């Protein structure tokens, strides 16, 4: 008989099958103990054929008992191997789960710090917007005063007909202020858009924190079940839990990287806004200086006196006023050149932001291909 080969190829027995095998073995032991009693109970006046058959039966029972003993040895060795393999598997799973939990806690702390930084930068942006609105109102008031003064000068002085360059510069200044207002409106829209993005990221951060809390609850439930004496989870459940944890860690890493990108974008926008505010301050001071230094308000009595003066004296007066007017135009030209520099800086920042966005897409594509 080839019983040992069958014992090697068959599947490992379950608990119910082991209990049945033990019952079968006990029954076989009892059956094996019967033949000598039956042989002793038989009368001595039997034939030799009958004794030969009994000897064959006894040999068969002995061989069966040996095979059963071998099977019992194999079963006990298999049980020992199973217990030895279960213990290191449990230890490795617990170690990996603890490492993943520590990583999740560290990433949660990093996300909290980034959210705090974003909120602080948004508060600074709101304050700067309020300052910009105040500066805009001051600029509008100064524009009104400049327009009134220019109207008085046009009505009172006749020498401005010989100065077409001054009129062209004034028209340039008038056309320049609406352009600044449009840029301010566009910057305000950008800040509102960034605020909406920050709110979206805060919502995603709350969802991630909820997922982490649910995972912690599940871990606590598993611990309670283990303490109550329930069966440990199988290998498939451990693998699924491990995959879920790895996916959560990947999501947290992607979220932290996107938060870093948003932080850099906000810093660039804040720098641009600071430069805008500085330029508006310079414009405001440049507007106040000619208003304070030059006698912009001319009375009707002075105009009457100028009309009475001869043309030679009028030309001398206009020649005296020419350097002051040229100084104001020079200051305005400097302001417009500073605006061009600011535009160039903004274009450089936009190129930098596009490079950052492209790198983020390149990083996300291999991650999606791997998943």
Curated annotation (Swiss-Prot):
Segments of this protein annotated with the region Basic motif: 121-188
Q: Which residues are recorded as modified (Phosphoserine)? A: 98, 202
Quick one: where's region Leucine-zipper?
245-266
On whether Nucleus is a keyword of this UniProt record, the answer is yes
Q: Which UniProt keywords apply?
A: Coiled coil, Cytoplasm, DNA-binding, Nucleus, Phosphoprotein, Transcription, Transcription regulation
The reply to whether Signal figures as a keyword in the UniProt entry is no
User: Which stretches does the entry tag as region Disordered?
Assistant: 223-246
Composition bias of kind Polar residues appears in: 223-240
Q: Name one GO molecular function term.
A: DNA binding
Q: Where is this region: Helix-loop-helix motif?
A: 110-120
Q: Subcellular localization, per the record?
A: Cytoplasm; Nucleus
Top-level taxon of origin:
Eukaryota
Give the main location. cytoplasm
Q: Which intervals of the chain form a coiled coil?
A: 96-148, 177-289
Q: InterPro entries under this entry?
A: Spz1
Gene Ontology CC terms: cytoplasm; nucleus
Q: Describe PTMs of this protein.
A: Phosphorylated by MAPK1/ERK2 and MAPK3/ERK1.
Query: What does this protein's UniProt record list under function?
Result: Transcription factor that binds to the DNA sequence 5'-CANNTG-3'(E box) and the G-box motif. May play an important role in the regulation of cell proliferation and differentiation during spermatogenesis.
Q: Miscellaneous notes for this chain? A: The helix-loop-helix and basic motifs form a SPZ1 specific bHLH different from the classical one.
- Protein name per UniProt: Spermatogenic leucine zipper protein 1
| Lineage of the organism | Eukaryota, Metazoa, Chordata, Craniata, Vertebrata
């Amino acid at each position: 008989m080839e019983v040992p080969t069958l014992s090697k190829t068959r599947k490992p027995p379950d608990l119910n099958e082991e209990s049945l095998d033990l019952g079968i073995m006990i029954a076989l032991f009892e059956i094996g103990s019967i033949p000598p009693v039956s042989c002793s109970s038989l009368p001595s006046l039997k034939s030799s054929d009958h004794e030969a058959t009994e000897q064959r039966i006894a040999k068969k029972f002995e061989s069966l008992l040996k095979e059963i003993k071998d099977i019992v040895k194999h079963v006990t060795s298999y049980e020992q191997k199973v217990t030895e393999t279960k213990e290191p598997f449990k230890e490795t799973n617990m170690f990996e789960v603890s490492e993943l939990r520590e990583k999740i806690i560290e990433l949660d702390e990093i996300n909290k710090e980034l959210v705090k930084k974003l909120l602080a930068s948004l508060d600074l942006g709101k304050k700067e917007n309020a300052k910009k609105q105040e500066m805009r109102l001051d600029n509008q008031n100064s524009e009104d005063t400049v327009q009134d003064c220019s109207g008085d000068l046009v009505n009172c002085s006749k020498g401005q007909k010989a100065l077409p360059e001054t009129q062209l510069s004034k028209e340039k200044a008038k056309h320049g202020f609406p352009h600044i207002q449009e840029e301010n409106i566009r910057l305000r829209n950008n800040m509102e858009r960034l605020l909406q993005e920050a709110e979206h990221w805060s919502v995603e951060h709350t969802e991630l924190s909820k997922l982490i809390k649910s995972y912690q609850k599940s871990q606590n439930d598993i611990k309670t079940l283990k303490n109550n004496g329930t069966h440990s989870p199988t290998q498939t459940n451990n693998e699924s839990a491990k995959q879920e944890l790895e996916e959560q860690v990947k999501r947290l890493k992607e979220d932290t990287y996107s938060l870093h990108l948003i932080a850099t974008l906000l810093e660039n926008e804040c720098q641009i806004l600071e430069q805008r505010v500085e330029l508006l301050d310079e414009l405001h001071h440049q507007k106040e200086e000619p208003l304070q230094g030059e006698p912009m308000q001319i009375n009707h009595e002075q105009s009457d006196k100028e009309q009475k003066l001869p043309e030679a004296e009028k030309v001398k007066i206009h020649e005296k006023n020419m350097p002051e007017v040229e100084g104001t135009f020079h200051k305005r030209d400097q302001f417009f050149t500073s605006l061009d520099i600011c535009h160039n800086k903004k274009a450089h920042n936009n190129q930098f932001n596009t490079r950052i966005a492209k790198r983020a897409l390149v990083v996300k594509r291999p991650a999606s291909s791997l998943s």
